[in-house]
């Protein structure tokens, strides 16, 4: 089941996007200097070490002490946090 979620997300990688508020939230939470947070998140998701799993309607991607939350229906990046 884990591999299925990962395969589905990776096959839809071009659909991943976020909102203006999402950009601000992700930049603040991860302390990023880049304006292209979607590219940053996609690169993390594409990393072979990324742990991808689904809970409810969301997909979660964990790598490098970062947790990215993506809506599994719209592929919208909702938020990203540092894992403490």
Regions found by a protein language model. Name each.
Residues 1-84:
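Ribonuclease/tRNase effector modules and their secretory precursors
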